[in-house]
């Protein structure tokens, strides 16, 4: 399900954003409205995701979100890149019942915090782990083929 990438763009940030958007595209969110992806405390990542959403013609909106305003948000998905795993978990717990699909690039163990934890392997490719407990609590359905691609450990 991954799109071929131009070799000049084949870097880890590009791959993380494309992987995030690809997983999101294989997810069935609870509502039928346009999906809002909120990026916590990282306007640069917001800008990059907006660029790739436009380039790949996805119908998502993206906004930067300060973690202080997390509870009052209307986000169907959230992207953490600088937030520690424990704080990710606390923020997600504060919005319990909203069904938020969460992604992180700052959660190597993936035991608490985000549902999908993206990382760069020692060979330079992008992979991810899945926290199945968080996924089941979110009540968001993700195509099982995506879950089969997750890595248990490097």
Regions found by a protein language model. Name each.
Residues 1-5:
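Bacterial N-terminal signal peptides
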Residues 8-154:
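Short hydrophobic alpha-helices and adjacent helix-cap/hinge residues
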């Amino acid at each position: 399900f991954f799109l071929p990438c131009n070799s000049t763009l084949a870097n880890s940030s590009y791959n993380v954003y494309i992987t995030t958007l690809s997983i999101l595209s294989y997810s069935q969110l609870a509502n039928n409205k346009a999906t809002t992806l909120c990026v916590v405390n990282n306007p640069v990542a917001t800008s990059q995701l907006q660029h790739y959403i436009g380039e790949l013609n996805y119908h998502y909106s993206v906004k930067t979100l300060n973690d202080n305003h997390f509870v009052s948000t209307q986000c169907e998905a959230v992207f953490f890149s600088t937030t520690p795993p424990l704080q990710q978990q606390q923020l997600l717990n504060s919005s319990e019942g909203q069904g938020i699909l969460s992604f992180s690039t700052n959660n190597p163990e993936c035991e608490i915090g985000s549902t999908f934890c993206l990382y760069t392997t020692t060979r330079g490719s992008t992979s991810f782990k899945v926290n199945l407990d968080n996924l089941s609590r979110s009540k968001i359905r993700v195509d099982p083929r995506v879950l089969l691609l997750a890595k248990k450990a490097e």
